[in-house]
């Protein structure tokens, strides 16, 4: 699935603490491999690289929903490498968590804030990225502020190549 609106919309959500900076920057697409696309932009603190994918399947009884995305970000100036983030396309239920399943044994729990879900810390991100490299599909289950359960399925085809690409681009 091509990510045509992600360069700008993705940045607004991914870097919500840096919204003004993100709006001022236009991300540059640097590579694409199967389901994943890599981007970079110059932030106030230096170069930022991220990779993104949209779900190949969405399930849930919702009437209106924005576009969900899975993202992995490197911010070398902040010593952040492989930060995993999911954008739901809706506001999560307050205090809820998101379950990410990769393969038969890889289940991860992420905390939510607004329309985004994050790992609790960098070691958790590293474990999740490692599982994403090994897997071929990833399922993300969340609950909206209205109580609607959603299940998004992502292809992990091209994930490893794009992770290597953003790691080379943002060391």
Predicted regions, residues:
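Bacterial N-terminal signal peptides that target proteins for export
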Residues: 1-8
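A generic "folded-domain core" signal
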Residues: 22-171
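Intrinsic disorder/low-complexity segments enriched in polar/small residues
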Residues: 3, 21-22
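Intrinsic disorder/low-complexity segments
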Residues: 8-11, 23
């Amino acid at each position: 699935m091509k990510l045509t609106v992600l360069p700008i919309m993705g940045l607004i959500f991914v870097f919500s603490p840096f919204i003004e900076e993100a709006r001022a920057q236009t991300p540059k697409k640097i590579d694409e491999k199967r389901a994943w696309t890599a981007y970079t932009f110059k932030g106030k603190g230096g170069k930022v690289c991220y990779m993104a994918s949209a779900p190949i399947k969405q399930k849930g009884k919702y009437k209106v929903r924005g576009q969900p995305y899975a993202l992995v970000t490197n911010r070398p100036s902040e010593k952040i490498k492989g930060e995993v983030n999911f954008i739901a396309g809706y506001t999560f239920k307050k205090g809820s968590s998101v379950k990410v399943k990769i393969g038969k044994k890889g289940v991860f729990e992420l905390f939510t804030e607004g329309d985004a879900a994050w790992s609790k810390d960098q070691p958790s991100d590293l474990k999740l990225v490692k599982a994403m490299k090994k897997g071929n599909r990833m399922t993300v289950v969340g609950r909206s502020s209205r109580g609607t359960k959603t299940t998004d399925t992502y292809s992990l085809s091209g994930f490893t190549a794009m992770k290597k690409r953003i790691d080379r681009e943002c060391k």
